[in-house]
């Protein structure tokens, strides 16, 4: 401990000012899009909406088409909105907590809980904690969610509302879920509760650098199981 304190003291004396924000692009990266700011574009969208105005509640059609193409999802199941997937997930959780579906808000339940894949993303944990949702961990393995651990947690706790995870290049350890793992995850959680939600934070969907495991788009896997309602994917 003394050695650590001494190291900390030395670093503190350097008066460093370092931005450690994760995922924040460098100015050189931002410069790549400078020309987009000066292009003259038609402000009227393909469906007649004036893009300079408020837009559409579920997003402009062009953005939804792009998102559907990236996700291999149906466009009528794709929403484009907000500045980040994190904000969309927060709004979804808040809506379920306060209002629920069919007038069944989570806030009325006794100790509503959520499963968190670990190691995981601290912002996921902070959102759940802020809503007062009890968190239970579920381990990761080389193929994705540790299904044995998942079954143990679902058997032990009666009021789990959903699970949150990063299915591709999982934070911070990098797991890429196999198709079999995702399919079994959906089957298990669907059997546990038909209103269970799997929040797949697909922040790294297109961020492959080295050779990476092939992963069938989650909407296609979920559709084949009749589990689209259980799978909420954010990018």
Question: Where in this protein do the model-derived segments appear?
Answer:
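N-terminal "arm"/small-domain region of PLP-dependent enzymes with the aminotransferase-like
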Residues: 1-72
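Residue-level marker for buried hydrophobic side chains located in beta-strands
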Residues: 198-199
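Conserved core of the PLP fold type I
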Residues: 49-194, 205-228
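Walker B catalytic acidic pair
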Residues: 202
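Conserved small/polar residues in nucleotide/adenosyl-binding loops
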Residues: 233-235
């Amino acid at each position: 401990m003394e050695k650590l304190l001494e190291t900390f003291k030395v670093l503190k004396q350097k008066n460093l000012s370092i931005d450690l924000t994760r995922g924040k692009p460098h100015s050189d990266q931002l410069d790549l899009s400078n020309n987009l700011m000066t292009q003259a574009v038609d402000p009227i969208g393909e469906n007649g909406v004036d893009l300079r105005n408020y837009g559409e509640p579920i997003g402009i059609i062009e953005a939804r088409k792009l998102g559907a193409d990236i996700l291999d999802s149906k466009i009528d199941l794709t929403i484009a909105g907000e500045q980040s997937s994190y904000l969309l997930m927060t709004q979804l959780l808040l809506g379920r907590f306060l209002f629920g579906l069919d007038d069944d808000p989570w806030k009325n339940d006794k100790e509503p809980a959520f499963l968190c894949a670990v190691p995981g993303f601290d912002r996921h944990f902070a959102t759940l904690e802020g809503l007062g949702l009890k968190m239970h961990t579920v381990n990761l393995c080389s193929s994705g969610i540790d299904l044995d651990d998942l079954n143990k947690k679902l058997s032990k706790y009666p009021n789990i509302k959903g699970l949150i995870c990063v299915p591709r290049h999982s934070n911070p350890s990098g797991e890429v879920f196999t198709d079999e793992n995702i399919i079994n995850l959906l089957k298990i959680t669907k059997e546990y509760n038909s209103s269970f939600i799997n929040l797949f934070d697909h922040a790294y969907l297109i961020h492959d650098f080295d050779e990476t495991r092939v992963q069938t788009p989650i909407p296609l896997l979920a559709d084949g199981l009749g589990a689209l309602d259980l799978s909420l994917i954010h990018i």
